[in-house]
C-alpha cells in the first residue's frame, strides 16, 4: 500500500529496488528516518518486529494517532476546514505554538515536582513530557492537512490546489491496520539504533541527503552524517542507507558496499521531462544475496536495465543490469 502522505525524500520511486536488496533474513526491521513511511507501507507485513522512527515530532505524532486514535483523528479532520492561504498560515502558526500540549500537562508536572523527590521527580517529568508529545490528535490533524494542502507537500507554502480531505478516510483506516503491530518512536537516530541493535536486526536509514538538509524541518548537520556512519559502523545487525550520489558520501562510506542507482526526478519533470536523480544504496552486507536466491525468471526480468557499478571496500566490479 502507499503512505498516507507525500514527504520530502519519499522513496516511492525507489522502494521496489530497495526491497530486492534487503537481507534475506532478519527478525526486526527498523526505519530510522521514517519520513512518510513509503518503504514500510509498501513492505508486506510479516512476523518480524517493526519500528517506525522519526525525530520530527509532528510526523511521529501523526503516525501514532493513525495507529492508536484513528476515530478521533478522523473526527478532527472533519472539523478543520482549509479554504485559503490565510487559513493555511494560521494552521502553520498553530503547529509551532509552545502551548500546544496537553491541557493537563502543567498541573501534572507541578504535582510530580511537589510530591516526588529527585531523581524520581525528574524521571516522572520526562515521562509526562514524552507522553504529551504523542497522541495529540488536534496537532496530528493540523499537520496532516498542512501536508496535503502545501505546495509539493513541503509544509511551507500554500499549494492552491483543491483537495477533498474526506477521500483520505479510507487510506487512514488502511494505514491503521498496517501499523497495528508497528512500534512508533520519536528518537534521535543514535539512541534508537543502540536501543534496537541485535545480531538479527535490520536498519533501513534514509537520512536527509547531503547538502540538501535545508529542505527538511529537522536540523541535520555535516557532523550528524559522520555520527550516523560511526554509529552504523559499530552495530551487530545489518543496515542499508540511501543517499544522494556524491563524492563526500562515497568517501564517508568507503568501507562498505556502495551501489549506484537512479530514479525519476519528480521535482524536475515539469521543466526536464525524463530527468533522473543519481542515488546510492550503502550496506554492511552483500546486497545481492536476496537477488541470487530468486528464481531464474526474476533474474532474467532484472536484465532489462542499464549496468551499474558497485564499489565494495575499494574494489569496483560490474553487476548484472538492474531495472531501476
What are these regions (language model features)?
Residues 1-34, 38-39, 45:
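S-adenosyl-L-methionine
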Residues 4, 25-29, 48-49, 179-183, ...:
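Short active-site oxyanion
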Residues 18, 29-43, 52-56, 63, ...:
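Conserved proline-anchored active-site loop of SAM-dependent methyltransferases
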Residues 42-46, 194-198, 248-255:
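Short loop/helix-cap segments at secondary-structure boundaries that form the rim of catalytic
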Residues 45-183, 300-301, 305-309:
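Class I S-adenosyl-L-methionine-dependent methyltransferase module
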Residues 157-161, 209-227:
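Mobile active-site "lid"/loop adjacent to the S-adenosyl-L-methionine
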Residues 183-185, 259:
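General small-molecule cofactor/ligand-binding pocket signal
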Residues 221-324:
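Long, positively charged, glycine-interspersed low-complexity recognition regions
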Amino acid at each position: 500500500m502507499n503512505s498516507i502522505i507525500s514527504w520530502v525524500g519519499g522513496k516511492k520511486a525507489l522502494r521496489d529496488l530497495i526491497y530486492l536488496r534487503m537481507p534475506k533474513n532478519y527478525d526486526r526491521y527498523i526505519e530510522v528516518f521514517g519520513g512518510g513511511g513509503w518503504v514500510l507501507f509498501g513492505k508486506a507485513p510479516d512476523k518480524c518486529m517493526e519500528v517506525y522512527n522519526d525525530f520530527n515530532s509532528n510526523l511521529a505524532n501523526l503516525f501514532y494517532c493513525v495507529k492508536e486514535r484513528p476515530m478521533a483523528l478522523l473526527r478532527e479532520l472533519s472539523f478543520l476546514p482549509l479554504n485559503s492561504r490565510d487559513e493555511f498560515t494560521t494552521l502553520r502558526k498553530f503547529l509551532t505554538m509552545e502551548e500546544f500540549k496537553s491541557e493537563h500537562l502543567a498541573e501534572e508536572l507541578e504535582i510530580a515536582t511537589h510530591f516526588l523527590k529527585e531523581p524520581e521527580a525528574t524521571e516522572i517529568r520526562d515521562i509526562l513530557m514524552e507522553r504529551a508529545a504523542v497522541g495529540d490528535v488536534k496537532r496530528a490533524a493540523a499537520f496532516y492537512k498542512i501536508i496535503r494542502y502545501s505546495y509539493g507537500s513541503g509544509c511551507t507554502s500554500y499549494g492552491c490546489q483543491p483537495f477533498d480531505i474526506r477521500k483520505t478516510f479510507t487510506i487512514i483506516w488502511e494505514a491503521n491496520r498496517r501499523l497495528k503491530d508497528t512500534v512508533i518512536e520519536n528518537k534521535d537516530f543514535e539512541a534508537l539504533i543502540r536501543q534496537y541493535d541485535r545480531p538479527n536486526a535490520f536498519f533501513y536509514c534514509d537520512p536527509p541527503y547531503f547538502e540538501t538538509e535545508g529542505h527538511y524541518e529537522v536540523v541535520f548537520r555535516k557532523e550528524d552524517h559522520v555520527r550516523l556512519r560511526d554509529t552504523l559502523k559499530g552495530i551487530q545487525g545489518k543496515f542499508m542507507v540511501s543517499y544522494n550520489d556524491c563524492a563526500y558520501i562515497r568517501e564517508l562510506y568507503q568501507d562498505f558496499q556502495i551501489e549506484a542507482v537512479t530514479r525519476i526526478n519528480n521535482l524536475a519533470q515539469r521543466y526536464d521531462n525524463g530527468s533522473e536523480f543519481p542515488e546510492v544504496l550503502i550496506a554492511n552486507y552483500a546486497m545481492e544475496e536476496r537477488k541470487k536466491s530468486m528464481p531464474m525468471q526474476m533474474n532474467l526480468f532484472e536484465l532489462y536495465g542499464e549496468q551499474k557499478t558497485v564499489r565494495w571496500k575499494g574494489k569496483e566490479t560490474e553487476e548484472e543490469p538492474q531495472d531501476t
